[in-house]
Regions:
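Short helix-to-coil transition segments within interhelical loops
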Residues: 79-88
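Hydrophobic alpha-helical transmembrane segments of membrane proteins
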Residues: 1-74, 93-456
């Protein structure tokens, strides 16, 4: 048996706890039966479905994230990282072992719900929805643990605020669909719901199960790679690139006109741009990281350069490749492009805008200080992208695109066919200025870093 899984079972399970859970659930079932004796089967199904969601999604998610936080706060995470377990063994051992007691109660609730649904209508549909809820919950746990490991700073004793925010986002995004899936009226027909996925026209339950399985696969991939990073197992960022493309492919299936042409490439580009910001603000991009990249580029094989490279350039390069493919597959003539004027120009502007924002982030990240650059970056983007253009637009509307190139979209609303020259010239000016500032920051901090290294 997996040693990490066995250790978590030893911590979570005991004969007393194993006996308490079914006893409490039996009392809850008795209460539900007493409150609604006319239709006890439906009441039991609804009540224990809600309990299933509460135990697995709510309590189980807290246990999964706490399994990492407790290791860090109790100073045992370093011992975990020195174990002989592979990243995959450590990952699934923690994933299923830390929430084993919550899953014990959740599976008991699911069993009661299935028995209560035996004599009801569309029994198999209810079972499929419960399966969707279980698979989606495991996917949620995998994504939560992966995000916590991705943002983990072992030098800090306090839990990461970013991890807490990611936990809230994932919990909200996953809990609501799971509740909908489990409590959906089984007497209603299995409609298409969100629309046919990739034009297959599957029933909503089967479609949701397929999407949940895909998200689970991507979550396990992210968890395995994040655990490998914490265990100091070097790897090239192929898993990140595959995850970004896989998530974009899942989303592209719900597009109004899904296909392997322009709609797919546009969705992949948007997903890659979003992941660029995610990697930028959750990873360390300080001077030491880029010094390691430059060192390996000069003295090591290419593989070591890829291993040391942060993830945001990978996402940005993926977005650029997808935009090139979008342009080559007649993206400007697609149905979506006809509905949104100058969509191709807006996408290229978004690509350059993302590169500019990454440069602003690095201007603050390359400082010789321990202060995190996130707050100053967001403040700069707000002032540069909202406050100053809004002030200038009231007096001189033509100057607003020079401060925020996306203000050139106003020309599209007025019937123009493109963003206008001022928007593109403004973006070019931004890139030149930001590149100069980053180069100055790098050269200004290099002597200080060199002196501190020699002193050590």
């Amino acid at each position: 048996m997996n040693p990490e899984f066995k250790r978590n079972l030893w911590l979570e399970m005991s004969s007393t706890r194993l006996a308490i859970m079914p006893g409490v659930l039996a009392l809850i079932g008795l209460l539900v039966y007493v409150l609604n004796p006319d239709d006890p089967q439906r009441s039991l199904f609804v009540a224990f479905s809600v309990l299933f969601v509460g135990l697995t999604v709510g309590w189980g998610s807290l246990l999964v994230v706490s399994s990492i936080n407790n290791e860090v706060s109790e100073r045992t995470w370093d011992q975990q990282r020195l174990s002989a377990l592979s990243p995959w063994d450590m990952a699934w051992g923690k994933l299923f072992g830390s929430a084993a007691y919550a899953w014990y109660g959740g599976l008991l609730c699911a069993l009661v719900a299935v028995v209560a649904a035996l004599s009801g209508p569309v029994f198999w549909s209810r079972c499929v929805w419960l399966l969707v809820g279980a698979v989606g919950t495991v996917a949620l746990h995998a994504w939560l643990m992966a995000s916590r490991l991705h943002t983990l700073d072992i030098r800090s004793e306090k839990a990461s605020g970013m991890a807490g925010r990611l936990f809230g986002v994932f919990l909200v995004l996953q809990t609501l669909p799971v509740i909908f899936m489990v409590l959906r009226d089984p007497s209603s027909p299995d409609r298409e719901g969100l629309g046919s996925w990739w034009g297959w026209g599957l029933p909503l339950s089967i479609q949701s199960l397929l999407v949940a399985l895909l998200l689970l696969a991507l979550g396990l991939l992210a968890l395995w790679r994040s655990m490998g990073k914490q265990l100091m197992v070097r790897g090239v960022p192929w898993a990140w690139a595959l995850g970004v493309l896989g998530l974009g492919w899942v989303i592209a299936g719900f597009m109004p006109a899904p296909g392997w042409g322009a709609p797919l490439w546009m969705t992949l580009a948007c997903t890659a741009l979003a992941s660029t910001y995610g990697a930028l603000f959750t990873e360390s991009n300080n001077r030491l990281v880029w010094q390691a990249v430059l060192y390996h580029r000069a003295y090591s094989p290419v593989r070591r350069v890829w291993q040391a490279l942060p993830l945001w350039p990978v996402s940005w390069a993926l977005a650029a490749v997808c935009l090139v493919a979008y342009s080559l597959t007649e993206g400007a003539a697609s149905e979506t492009a006809r509905e949104v004027p100058a969509l191709q120009g807006l996408m290229w502007m978004a690509l350059l805008h993302t590169l500019r924002d990454c440069g602003i982030y690095h201007f603050f990240a390359l400082r010789n200080t321990n202060r995190k650059p996130t707050a100053m970056t967001l403040l700069t983007l707000f002032v540069l992208g909202v406050v100053l253009p809004a002030l200038v637009a009231s007096a001189a509307p033509g100057l607003a695109p020079w401060l925020e190139p996306f203000f050139g979209a106003k020309a599209l609303a007025m019937g123009e066919a493109s963003l206008g020259a001022s928007a593109w010239l403004g973006m070019a000016l931004h890139l030149v200025v930001v590149a100069g500032l980053v180069a100055w920051r790098w050269s200004a901090g290099a002597p200080v870093a060199l002196r501190s290294t020699r002193a050590d």
